């Protein structure tokens, strides 16, 4: 006989699939003003992500996980084109490649792409990320409605955080 507590903790692959969202689409993940000099940690479609701007103002997005010990990169430092982990200072660039491991000379991690990166577009006051699957890593063009990008229209970004499944938010 199975107790209710054991039954409730079973893995549900369908629920996990639904929580990860519809893949191969651009999603607005943050307003542009939210990402400035310090790295910002967000969770979207069940994925933890770090966002930061480089020295030219371009936004980068990586999985929020240091390849060395799994610490959150969003708690680290913005070095311009890369972010440094707060734990041991591992430097990871916007492509997910480890640039430097300060504590280990000639570390085998250096020059290796160890962290998932996301294609980023910044348009209409929002930061969009491409959530592609393994079969579609290259993003489709991000084509927004003319009302959001043309100068003859006024627009503003309205943001609200809902603690719910993305499916309910899309419907409303």
What residue spans do the PLM features occupy?
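Local cysteine-cluster metal-coordination motifs and their immediate loop/turn environment
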Residues: 60-74, 80-93
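Rieske [2Fe-2S] iron-sulfur-binding subdomain
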Residues: 1-58, 74, 92-172
């Amino acid at each position: 006989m199975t107790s209710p507590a054991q039954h409730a903790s079973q893995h549900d692959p369908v629920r996990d699939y639904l929580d990860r969202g519809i893949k191969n689409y651009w999603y607005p993940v943050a307003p542009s003003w939210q990402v400035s000099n310090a790295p910002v940690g967000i969770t979207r479609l069940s994925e933890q992500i770090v966002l930061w701007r480089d020295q030219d103002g371009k936004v980068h997005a990586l999985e929020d996980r240091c390849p060395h010990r799994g610490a959150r990169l969003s708690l680290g430092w913005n070095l311009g084109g890369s972010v440094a982990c707060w734990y041991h200072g591992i430097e990871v660039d916007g492509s997910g490649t480890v640039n430097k491991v300060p504590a280990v000379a000639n570390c085998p991690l250096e020059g290796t792409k160890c962290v998932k990166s996301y294609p980023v577009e910044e348009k209409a006051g929002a930061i969009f990320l491409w959530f592609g699957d393994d079969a579609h890593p290259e993003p489709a063009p991000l084509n927004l409605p003319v009302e959001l990008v043309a100068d003859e229209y006024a627009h503003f970004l309205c943001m609200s955080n809902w603690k719910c499944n993305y499916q309910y938010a899309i419907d409303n």
